[in-house]
Amino acid sequence: MNYPLLMAQAIILFVPALIANSGAVLTGGYFVLDRGKNFIDGRRILGDGKTLSGYLGGSFIGIVSGVIIYWISYATHFILGNYGSIALSIEIPAVMAFGSLTGDILGSFVKRRIGIKSGGKGGLLDQWPFALVAFLFLFLMERPFFLHYYFFAGIIVILAIVPPLHRAVNIIGYKLHKKDVPW
């Protein structure tokens, strides 16, 4: 088995989960998910940064990226990896995109519970929950795909690249005035 190629494929095929997170920033801002309400601890449930438009828009952008990856893979005779079929090129990226943004929301929920306000630095709580929940969704809903591309080493590689990639994308978003803070 060609492990370097499999690692590259794992990264490329995970792009919908990564893109969805950035897409949420671009499409967000409308219909705050927690509607301004507080949890039983008196703190906001999620904060103003988690919106329905971001969740749906980011997921849509993630799905579109998956379809694009499928067609590029098809044109290159699947050297970049393969979702399996045209239908799966929509389904698998949808699972990853919705998983990614659900993980981002869960990370925000945990951050609020430990006293980190919306926009505050959360370290790995800002970076890993979206990837971990995308993996969980894949494992639960697309197990054959998950087991082929995301064995132990594939997960480790993704988790290793997420923090610097997340930081770089957030700095770009900050410079483009799409984010209030560069993290």
Curated annotation (Swiss-Prot):
Keywords: Cell membrane, Lipid biosynthesis, Lipid metabolism, Magnesium, Membrane, Phospholipid biosynthesis, Phospholipid metabolism, Transferase, Transmembrane, Transmembrane helix. InterPro entries: CarS, CarS_archaea. Pathway: Membrane lipid metabolism; glycerophospholipid metabolism. GO terms for cellular component: plasma membrane. Its main location: membrane. The chain crosses the membrane at residues 11-31, 60-80, 86-106, 122-142, 145-165. Its EC number is 2.7.7.67. It catalyses: 2,3-bis-O-(geranylgeranyl)-sn-glycerol 1-phosphate + CTP + H(+) = CDP-2,3-bis-O-(geranylgeranyl)-sn-glycerol + diphosphate. GO terms for molecular function: CDP-2,3-bis-(O-geranylgeranyl)-sn-glycerol synthase activity. It is found in: Cell membrane. It is an enzyme of class 2 (transferase). It is a multi-pass membrane protein. Its cofactor is Mg(2+). GO terms for biological process: glycerophospholipid biosynthetic process. NCBIfam families: PRK04032.1. Catalyzes the formation of CDP-2,3-bis-(O-geranylgeranyl)-sn-glycerol (CDP-archaeol) from 2,3-bis-(O-geranylgeranyl)-sn-glycerol 1-phosphate (DGGGP) and CTP. This reaction is the third ether-bond-formation step in the biosynthesis of archaeal membrane lipids. Belongs to the CDP-archaeol synthase family. This is CDP-archaeol synthase. It comes from Thermoplasma volcanium (strain ATCC 51530 / DSM 4299 / JCM 9571 / NBRC 15438 / GSS1).
